[in-house]
Amino acid sequence: LAGVMGLLGDKGEKHLFGNQFSQFVKGSTELKYYRRLWGDNWLASRFLVGAGHAYGNSKVMPYSEQFYIGGANSIRAFTIRTLGPGSYRPPQDNPNAYFDQTGDFKLEANIEFRFKIIGDLHGAIFMDAGNIWLLKEDPQRPGGKLTLKSFGKDIALGTGFGLRYDISYIVLRADLGIGLHTPYPNPDKKGYYNLSSFKNSLGFHLAIGY
């Protein structure tokens, strides 16, 4: 659409029915691998990478198209939209802070050992890692840009365990995540484990499906 308008000589802001529209490209890919170890015991792994770039009319992608991380289907030690971008951490006294915790680039990995307990009840031990980043510097969100220098420290890490009840056509899932490392610095913690307390490192989630 923007290309057609360019051919027609419209070199300024692009509009559709009188409204300016967003211009961006976005893509993501997800890889999953399952391996039966023995009996009803499985090793399941997942890797996801996604990126987006705004251009033309837009300086940023629409909010609904930006990446976020955390929650029942992500890094389970952290609730949804409480990580990133990068090492940025919004003011904790701002109830709307989670609006700022989105990014242009997402990297996430999960590995899970699934085992049968009894009947249709299964258990799982898992580890999750990842974060989101900005591809452009944002003065309002310092530390949010993806850089090679801070990449390792920016990766959030969590572990945990859960229960799965398999009713043949649906799986009910409960997970308790335990945070091991957050991307934002904690002046009271010097080592890799930098959660303020064990209680604050916990995340509980209920979900349907794997």
Residue ranges and their predicted role:
Residues 165-170, 196-210:
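Outer-membrane beta-barrel "beta-signal"
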Residues 110-112, 156-164:
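Short glycine-rich, acidic/polar surface loops and turns
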Residues 38-43, 119-123, 165-173:
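Repeated loop/turn-to-beta-strand initiation elements of outer-membrane beta-barrel proteins
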Residues 5-8, 138-156, 187-197:
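Outer-membrane beta-barrel domain signature, especially the mid-to-C-terminal portions
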Residues 33-35, 113-115, 165-167, 176-178, ...:
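Residue-level signature of outer-membrane beta-barrel architecture
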Residues 1-115, 126-145:
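C-terminal outer-membrane beta-barrel translocator/porin domains of Gram-negative envelope proteins
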Residues 128-130, 135, 160, 164, ...:
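Flexible, small/polar- and glycine-enriched "cap/hinge" segments at structural transition points
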